[in-house]
């Protein structure tokens, strides 16, 4: 979008570059000079947003749909994230809520591009900003890990207060059980809030 530093119109090649980044699965795109020293910072953001929305909503975008099948150390977590995304689509869940310590679960869910909100709760302040750059992810600080049941109830209530869920919405919750065992999501639960 570099020509938009001085021009209201992007070149065909620039539009193609932005579109290809979406088709390649990029979670985020970045502008630099276009908004910091450019003559049309608002217009360049509008143009890029329009390109991104158009390409993301295209039927030409194909998200891989094959379930994980290589039994690595993270096989259970990967499988649960995959099935959470599929289940959320099937039951039209409004959100997938998960806890994470490293961010791995958020990366996995985001990769499947579910239509549900991806709400990620972590006690690791270092990764909050990184998580919010992932496709579809909204990350929140949460540090009250008492029991799995209580935690699921609390994060669903937080999601309601933040406007991501309403009463009677379905939500897919991912946690580790016991909850003290951080690092390995092994539980998928469907709730109606």
Question: Where do the PLM segments sit?
Answer:
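Nucleotide-binding motor/catalytic cores of P-loop/tubulin-like NTPases across gene-expression machines
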Residues: 105-107, 113-151
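Long, charged amphipathic helices and adjacent flexible linkers at domain junctions
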Residues: 48-85
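C-terminal binding/interaction regions
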Residues: 160-174, 178, 185-190
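C-terminal helical cap(s) of enzyme catalytic domains, especially alpha/beta-barrels
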Residues: 35-57, 187-190
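Active-site mouth loops of central-metabolism enzymes
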Residues: 1-13, 70, 74
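Conserved, mostly hydrophobic/aromatic
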Residues: 21, 109, 171
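Flexible, glycine/charged-enriched surface loops at secondary-structure junctions
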Residues: 32-33, 38, 57-67, 94, ...
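Glycine-rich phosphate-binding active-site loops on the catalytic face of alpha/beta enzymes
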Residues: 18-41
């Amino acid at each position: 979008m570099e020509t938009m530093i001085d021009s209201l119109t992007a070149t065909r090649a620039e539009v193609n570059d932005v579109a290809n980044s979406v088709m390649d699965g990029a979670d985020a795109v970045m502008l630099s000079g276009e908004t910091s020293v450019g003559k049309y910072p608002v217009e360049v953001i509008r143009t890029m947003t329009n390109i991104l929305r158009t390409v993301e909503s295209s039927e030409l975008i194909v998200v891989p749909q094959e379930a994980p099948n290589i039994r690595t150390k993270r096989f259970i977590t990967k499988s649960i994230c995959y099935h959470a995304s599929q289940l959320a689509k099937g039951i039209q869940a409004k959100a997938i809520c998960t806890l994470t310590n490293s961010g791995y679960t958020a990366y996995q869910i985001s990769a499947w591009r579910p239509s549900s909100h991806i709400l990620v709760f972590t006690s690791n302040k270092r990764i909050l900003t990184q998580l919010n750059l992932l496709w579809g992810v909204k990350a929140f600080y949460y540090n009250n890990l008492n029991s799995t049941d209580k935690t699921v109830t609390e994060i669903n209530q937080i999601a309601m207060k933040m406007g991501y869920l309403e009463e009677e919405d379905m939500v897919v919750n991912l946690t580790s059980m016991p909850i003290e065992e951080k690092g390995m999501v092994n539980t998928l639960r469907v709730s109606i809030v």
